Amino acid sequence: MPPKVSSKGAKKAGKAKAARSGDKKRKRRRKESYSIYIYKVLKQVHPDTGVSSKAMSIMNSFVNDIFERIAAEASRLAHYNKRSTITSREIQTAVRLLLPGELAKHAVSEGTKAVTKYTSSK
C-alpha cells in the first residue's frame, strides 16, 4: 500500500511546479507604514532609546487614525463652506478642532513651519 500524502504536501508540490514551469515569482505587495519616520523622530528626541515592533505597530495605527480624523474633519469643513478643495486652512482648522489646547498650538506651529519650508524649497 503506498504512503498517504497529506493535502499540504500536495499543495506545496503543485506550487513548486507552477513556479518552475512559468518562472513567474509573485511579488509581495509592499506594506506602507510610517515606521521609518516615527523612528527618525524617536532618534531626534531620545537618541539612545529603541522601540519594539509591537510599539511601532501601535504608533503606526495611531498616526493613521489621527490622519483619517484630520482628513475627515477637513473634508467636512470644506463641504460646510461649499469648497471643493481642502487647503492648509481647512487642515489647520481641523487640527484646532480635534486636538486639545496646547497640543493644537504646537501642531499648528509645526505645520506652518513645514508648509513654509516646503514652499521656500520650490
From Swiss-Prot:
Monoubiquitination of Lys-117 gives a specific tag for epigenetic transcriptional activation and is also prerequisite for histone H3 'Lys-4' and 'Lys-79' methylation. GlcNAcylation at Ser-109 promotes monoubiquitination of Lys-117. It fluctuates in response to extracellular glucose, and associates with transcribed genes. It is found in: Nucleus; Chromosome. It comes from the Eukaryota. Glycans are attached at residue 109. One of its GO terms (molecular function) is DNA binding. GO terms for cellular component: nucleosome; nucleus. Keywords: Chromosome, DNA-binding, Glycoprotein, Isopeptide bond, Nucleosome core, Nucleus, Ubl conjugation. Residues 9-31 have a biased composition (Basic residues). SUPFAM superfamilies: Histone-fold. Residues 1-31 are annotated as: Disordered. There is a cross-link at residue 117 (Glycyl lysine isopeptide (Lys-Gly) (interchain with G-Cter in ubiquitin)). This is Histone H2B, gonadal. It comes from Patella granatina (Sandpaper limpet).
